[in-house]
Amino acid sequence: DAKIDSMFEYENYTTYKFQLSPPYNSNEPLHGYVIYANKIKTALKPIIHFPSAWAIGSNSDDWIINSTIKDFNYLLMEGYVVICPVYYSTYNRKKTLKTWWANDTEAYKNTIIKIGKDYKRSIDFIESRNEFDINDLSYMGYSWGSIMSNILLAIDDRVKSAFICAGGLQVQKSKPEIDPALYTRRITIPVMHITGKNDGIFDYENSQIPMQKLLGTPLEKQEMIVLDG
């Protein structure tokens, strides 16, 4: 039931908005944006993107297209297409989160579950598009997107690889249904993770290393790059 609208060319890129029925009871559609370079004539290699925590505080998604082109131009020009779903409780959708910080409330649990359902529904959309090579689907996330990868990469095996930056394993208590430590060990795909050893939020010893140790990916398919700073 995907609806495609607002397709237009922006300089050397094509972008469009998609809308889907959400996989849960809701009056608002799940929507998102697709961005790719016009020069690419072969099947596009899809990347499903998860935003930073800025998406929780923002009430508009107007800047997604411009920022994606600016930040990921090097990927677009290499034949990748970036898909940016507007997940539950982000941007201009109904807000049930005030922070990315985990807690053990039912409200937080239900929000994360809905985000996971939006993620899987968005992958359904990617799989339905003939111009995308679903067999080359990858995940990309920074900060909150890195944290959420602990759960998301474990719940859909159509994603074949992941690049995450900053983040780690959340140590705050949450409901067992969404405890990231129970999911991380189920991730088996290749993962590249770039972190900072002096990260003041995602501590190297208590967040970054535990995530790496729990990761179910074989060591030869993990690449953890730790920067000074």
Per-range role (PLM):
Residues A2-T42:
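N-terminal cap/lid segment of alpha/beta-hydrolase-fold proteins
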Residues H31-G32, A43-W54:
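Short beta-strand element of the alpha/beta-hydrolase
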Residues I48-P51, P85-Y87, C165, L227:
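Alpha/beta-hydrolase
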Residues A53-K117, I123, S174:
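Cap/lid segment of the alpha/beta-hydrolase catalytic domain
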Residues K120-Y183:
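Primarily recognizes the serine-hydrolase "nucleophile elbow" in alpha/beta-hydrolase
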Residues D179-P180, I189, D203-K213:
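Short alpha-helix in the alpha/beta-hydrolase fold that links the catalytic acid
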Residues I187, H193-T195, D199:
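Short beta-strand/loop motif that positions the catalytic acidic residue
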Residues Q208, Q212-G229:
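Catalytic histidine neighborhood in serine/cysteine hydrolases
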